[in-house]
């Protein structure tokens, strides 16, 4: 191996080539337009670069005095200014229609998403089918339907980005930005915060689950009800006794606080802590006792007074909320 550093860099680059968070593996119309524009812009930039290289090579190879002043100026004018301007103008005309927002209708599903340090509050708007619904760190969408995402923030500026669905949009405290999307295929995808927002910025992801319309309607109707798994368990008693309900809501109980993530249907979620850990019993118990270890800067206080067995009991209770 003549150049180990080159191979090391190449291998590190290959390690980042996966489809988990890629703007090239799309499942939405908006992301498809972004991908097509990116490809065309890359081609246009390559053409302009090639023209400039040709001018440079032509000038190097020409004998001294072979190009007159006026001849050289014409080459520079046409190939160095007019040509690139025409290419860039054509690319701009192509991109303008894609900047127009998608049309919406009064009956379209509206989902409010708010970025907080360091998690996501998700609220499905009320409709004729039923009341609103609050969740956290997971967004479910019906395939083939237009969805209006109303984006805001509670603390600092965040940036909402689902690479495979649409472009980035800032989430600004005190302001609501709208992003209209339409998923084209079912599946589970990843979204992230794309703007530095604090210590755990890199630990702030969320799941996007695109579902067949019938499955989505059934899920939404079921999720509006009380969480299954409620009862007189030891974990629920500990949850109540240690004041967890002062920050977290669970539908079907007296807890309706809105400071921290809503824990209703927690047992259905695929990740813990906004996409950073698998929701195993051990991880949930450890997060309850010392959340700052997994997520520095999180506002949830530690509970060192809980024994390991007590934390595990609360974890079992949360796992049963489905």
Where are these regions (language model features)?
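Short, solvent-exposed mixed-charge patches
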Residues: 321-322
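Hydrophobic alpha-helical transmembrane segments of multi-pass integral membrane proteins
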Residues: 11-13, 42-56, 81-91
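Membrane-embedded alpha-helical segments of integral membrane proteins
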Residues: 26-63
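N-terminal secretory/membrane targeting signals
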Residues: 1-19
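Non-transmembrane, membrane-proximal soluble domains of secreted or membrane proteins
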Residues: 18-36, 63-258, 275-296, 302-316
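Hydrophobic alpha-helical transmembrane segments
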Residues: 5, 38, 42-43, 77-78
């Amino acid at each position: 191996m003549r150049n180990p550093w080159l191979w090391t860099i190449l291998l590190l680059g290959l390690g980042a080539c996966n489809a988990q968070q890629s703007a090239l593996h799309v499942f939405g119309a908006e992301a498809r337009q972004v991908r097509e524009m990116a490809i065309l812009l890359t081609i246009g930039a390559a053409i302009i670069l090639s023209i400039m290289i040709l001018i440079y090579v032509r000038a190097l190879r020409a004998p001294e005095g072979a190009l007159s002043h006026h001849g050289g100026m014409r080459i520079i004018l046409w190939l160095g200014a007019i040509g690139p301007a025409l290419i860039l103008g054509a690319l701009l005309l192509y991109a303008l229609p894609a900047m127009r927002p998608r049309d919406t209708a009064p009956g379209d599903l509206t989902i409010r998403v708010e970025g907080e340090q360091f998690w996501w509050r998700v609220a499905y708007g009320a409709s004729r089918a039923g009341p609103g619904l609050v969740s956290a760190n997971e967004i479910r969408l019906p395939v083939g339907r237009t969805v209006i995402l109303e984006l805001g923030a509670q603390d600092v500026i965040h940036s909402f980005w689902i690479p495979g669905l649409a472009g980035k949009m800032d989430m600004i405290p005190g302001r609501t930005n709208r992003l209209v999307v339409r998923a084209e295929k079912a599946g589970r995808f990843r979204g992230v915060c794309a703007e530095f927002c604090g210590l755990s910025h890199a630990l702030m992801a969320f799941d996007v689950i695109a579902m067949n319309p019938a499955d989505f309607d059934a899920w939404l109707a079921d999720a509006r009800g009380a969480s299954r798994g409620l009862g007189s368990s030891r974990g629920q008693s500990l949850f109540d006794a240690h004041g967890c309900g002062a920050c977290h809501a669970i539908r079907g109980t007296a807890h309706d606080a809105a400071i921290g993530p809503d824990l209703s249907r927690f047992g259905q979620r695929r990740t813990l802590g906004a996409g950073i850990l698998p929701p195993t019993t051990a991880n949930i118990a450890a997060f309850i006792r010392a959340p700052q270890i997994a997520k520095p800067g999180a506002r949830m206080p530690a509970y060192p007074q809980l024994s390991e067995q007590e934390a595990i009991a609360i974890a079992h209770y949360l796992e049963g909320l489905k």
